[in-house]
UniProtKB/Swiss-Prot annotation:
Source organism of the structure: Mycobacterium tuberculosis (strain ATCC 25618 / H37Rv)
Region: Disordered, residue numbers: 26-50
Note: Is extremely stable under aerobic conditions.
Highest taxon above the source species: Bacteria
Gene: korB
Stated name of the protein: 2-oxoglutarate oxidoreductase subunit KorB
InterPro entries with a match to the protein in the record: 2-oxoacid:Fd_oxidoreductase, THDP-binding, TPP_enzyme_TPP-bd
Gene Ontology BP term (one): tricarboxylic acid cycle
Enzyme class, spelled out: oxidoreductase
Subunit structure: KG oxidoreductase (KOR) is composed of KorA and KorB subunits.
Pfam families: TPP_enzyme_C (PF02775)
GO cellular component labels: cytosol; peptidoglycan-based cell wall
Keyword set, alphabetical order: Magnesium, Oxidoreductase, Tricarboxylic acid cycle
Length: 373
């Protein structure tokens, strides 16, 4: 099969125009560029739906819900242009309780649905609410590909280290040795570190917060909501029925020696009196006593390092016992988003392509042809 000279020239022109297009690779827009705003004052109650909240008493989801409700007015966006998409699990009831649009979708597929919505509707602020089971088990592939593509969505991953809705089985973040209904002799699985996973997928924004730390949670959410691109926020939260006290070590006596709060541009020191710090150790990082190191050896947190290796090393400081758990923003860099590039590519193709049969034939023929004798 051969292609006529006119068709070959036509196809070359189309693809040449596409190759020379910037395809939206200008990562200077804000998260909600193109999303309609409102000049009407908003309060937390404006984002409260008429649905009865059906979580167990004491569930950490209540704190997160109230924090989100009180935070959303800061964005100044029309409620009709905010969408929360969830999968399956206790956390996935979230869209019912917000006076915005939402999807309560299927297990693990919220990032895929959010990807399509972000591509199709630039006028929407798209959020994903998921849990450790929903996101990291059946939804693992959807999550990492949304992150690596840098889709313009904000993903909230509620991590209670247990399957709550299905009544207490171990999850992908449960500790080794976790005794549950499905692991009566203790879990053998090595758990995922959600922050490490997101950084491995090269997410452009990765943060972690504790449900009971309202100020810290709001600070991370505020930054994630303004970040254009894929933003993942892991929220450590309690399940009082099936995994009660899972994160008590980060709340009770001695928490100052376990929690490391990081802020961009500030030295990483912690402890009741700043007696501990983070320093370099070989190819990674380690905790040292502040009195034992020179001041210039203490790491100054830089969330804007392009290489994710530094943020990854920071995420590896903690273990399943929660010693040296880092809270705050690990990584916050700028990179072109997939949805911006895709929309620009569509515009370029429409502008470059001729109409009629010739255009269809040029696409069917492709760029390379062979003659078969």
């Amino acid at each position: 099969m051969t292609r006529s000279g006119d068709e070959a020239q036509l196809m070359t022109g189309v693809t040449g125009d596409l190759a020379g297009t910037e395809l939206g690779l200008t990562p200077s827009l804000t998260k909600n560029a193109g999303v309609p705003t409102t000049d009407q004052p908003q309060k937390g109650k404006d984002f409260t739906s008429d649905q009865e909240v059906r979580w167990c008493p004491g569930c950490g989801d209540y704190v997160i819900l109230n924090t989100i409700r009180n935070f959303l007015p800061e964005l100044g966006l029309r409620r009709e242009n905010i969408v929360f998409i969830s999968g399956i699990g206790c956390s996935s009831r979230f869209p019912y309780y917000l006076e915005t649009y939402g999807f309560h979708s299927i297990h693990g597929r919220a990032p895929a649905i959010a990807t399509g919505l972000a591509l199709a509707r630039e006028d929407l602020s798209v959020w994903v609410v998921t849990g450790d089971g929903d996101a990291l088990s059946i939804g693992g592939n959807h999550l990492i590909h949304a992150l690596r593509r840098n889709i313009n969505v904000t993903i909230l991953l509620f991590n209670n280290r247990i399957y709550g809705l299905t009544k207490g089985q171990y999850s992908p973040t449960s500790e080794v040795g976790k005794v549950t209904k499905s692991t009566p002799m203790g879990s053998l699985d090595h758990p995922f570190n959600p922050v490490s996973l997101a950084l491995g997928a090269e997410a452009t924004f990765v943060g972690r917060a504790l449900d009971s730390d309202r100020n810290g949670l709001t600070e991370v959410l505020r930054a994630a909501a303004q970040h254009r691109g894929a933003a993942l926020v892991e929220i450590l939260q309690d399940c009082p029925i099936f995994n009660d006290g899972s994160f008590d070590a980060l709340r009770k006596e001695g928490a100052e020696e376990r929690v490391i709060k990081v802020r961009h541009g500030e030295p990483i020191v912690f402890g009741a009196n700043g007696e501990y710090c983070v320093v370099k150790s070989g190819f990674g990082l380690e905790v040292a006593k502040t009195a034992d190191v020179a001041i210039d050896e203490i790491i100054v947190h830089d969330a804007q390092v392009d290489d994710p290796a530094y943020a990854f090393a920071l995420s590896r400081l903690s273990d399943q016992n929660l010693d040296h758990t880092v809270l705050g923003i690990f990584r916050h860099i700028s990179r072109p988003t997939y949805d911006d590039a895709a929309r620009s590519q569509v515009v370029a193709a429409r502008n470059a392509a001729p109409s009629g049969t010739a255009a269809l034939q040029s696409l069917l023929h492709g760029r390379d042809t062979w003659t078969v004798d």
